[in-house]
């Protein structure tokens, strides 16, 4: 009917959909010419990423079958107050468990998600809250670093009206307490989700539906690669196609052309026509140059005359003898060798 708008169902919060949203956000940030232009598009993209992460977080911790709680708050009554509460981390009971990484998440995304959902500020404080242990020891005892002398804890603060602040603080405490309960190895769904988010941020996430890991890696690399928008390519004329008949060798037509082209197009006789007419028996091999510069095989040593003058220092040329040997080790004695005694 006229006037009715079609409402499409929102996509389900899946890791693949979250990866697509993150890739779109990276693409928009990589285009300097479009940064700050599509403000509404960027806002909608951030809201969709927040919604998908929130739904995935709720499904991970609370289960997909549980009813979602309403985040509606009453109207504020009274002045703005600040409330805070400390939740100590059970590091003594579980010394090998990484509570700090579980609470903060990859690049602080889990803590940011809790802050956006509860409206409270969540910070990890106390001994062991800093990643750099040397820097922690240096800051211990300095002003504004007094919390390093306390045990590891989570500090939750909220600023709002009294009635609203109490509701927000209660929700935040419930959510943080869920993170302080360690799960068995292999059954920690929150850890799996955090690793998946880290893979999406690093560009190494692979879809479980793809059977070929090489194809999944190529898709992830293509998604992470920056795409450059270019103008339309100029239309070039089509290249000339090859003739269907094979072309002949290039040497023989050239020789035939030289042989047959006795008259040039302007009517003057070809310069090689006289040479060819003088020596028709030469055939295809002819030389327009003088004889000393022609290509000839190397002269055999047997063609040189034998020097018999007996000049001192002259090299005696050996004469090739064509006598056949009956036995390979038999020595042939000829008349000249018999005369000289050799």
Curated annotation (Swiss-Prot):
InterPro entries: BBP-like, KH_1_KHDC4/BBP-like, KH_dom, KH_dom_type_1_sf, Quaking_NLS, STAR_dimer. GO terms for cellular component: cytoplasm; nucleus. Its main location: nucleus. Signal peptide: none annotated. CDD domains: KH-I_Hqk (cd22465). The keyword RNA-binding applies. The keyword Flavoprotein does not apply. GO terms for molecular function: mRNA binding. Keywords: Cytoplasm, Developmental protein, Differentiation, mRNA processing, mRNA splicing, mRNA transport, Nucleus, RNA-binding, Translation regulation, Transport. A motif (Nuclear localization signal) lies at residues 325-331. SMART domains: KH. PANTHER family: KH DOMAIN-CONTAINING RNA-BINDING PROTEIN QKI, RNA-BINDING PROTEIN RELATED. Belongs to the quaking family. Homodimer; does not require RNA to homodimerize. This is KH domain-containing RNA-binding protein qki.L. It comes from Xenopus laevis (African clawed frog). The gene is qki.L.
């Amino acid at each position: 009917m006229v006037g009715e708008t079609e409402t499409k169902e929102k996509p389900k919060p899946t890791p693949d959909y979250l990866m697509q949203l993150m890739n779109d956000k990276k693409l928009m940030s990589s285009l300097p010419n479009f940064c700050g232009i599509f403000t509404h598009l960027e806002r909608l993209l951030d809201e969709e990423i927040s919604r998908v992460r929130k739904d995935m977080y709720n499904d991970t911790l609370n289960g997909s079958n549980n009813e979602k709680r309403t985040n509606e708050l009453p109207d504020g009554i009274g002045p703005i107050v600040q409330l805070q509460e400390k939740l100590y981390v059970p590091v003594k009971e579980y010394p090998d468990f990484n509570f700090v990484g579980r609470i903060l998440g990859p690049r602080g995304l889990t803590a940011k998600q809790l802050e956006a959902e509860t409206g409270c500020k969540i910070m990890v404080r106390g001994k062991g809250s800093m990643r750099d242990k040397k820097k922690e020891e240096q800051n211990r005892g300095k002003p504004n670093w007094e919390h390093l002398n306390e045990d590891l804890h989570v500090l939750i603060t909220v600023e709002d009206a009294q009635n609203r602040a109490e509701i927000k603080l209660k929700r935040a405490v419930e959510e943080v307490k869920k993170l302080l309960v360690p799960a068995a190895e292999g059954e920690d769904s929150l850890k799996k989700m955090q690793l998946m988010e880290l893979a999406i941020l690093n560009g190494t996430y692979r879809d479980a539906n793809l059977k070929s890991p090489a194809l999944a890696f190529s898709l992830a690399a293509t998604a992470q690669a920056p795409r450059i928008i270019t103008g339309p390519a100029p239309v070039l004329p089509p290249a000339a196609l090859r003739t269907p008949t094979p072309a002949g060798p290039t040497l023989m037509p050239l020789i035939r052309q030289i042989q047959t082209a006795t008259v040039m197009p302007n009517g003057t006789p070809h310069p090689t026509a006289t040479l060819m007419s003088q020596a028709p028996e030469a055939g295809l091999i002819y030389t327009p140059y003088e004889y000393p510069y022609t290509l000839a095989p190397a002269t055999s040593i047997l063609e040189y005359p034998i020097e018999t003058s007996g000049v001192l220092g002259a090299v005696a040329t050996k004469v090739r003898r064509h006598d056949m040997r009956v036995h390979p080790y038999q020595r042939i004695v000829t008349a000249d060798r018999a005369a000289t005694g050799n």
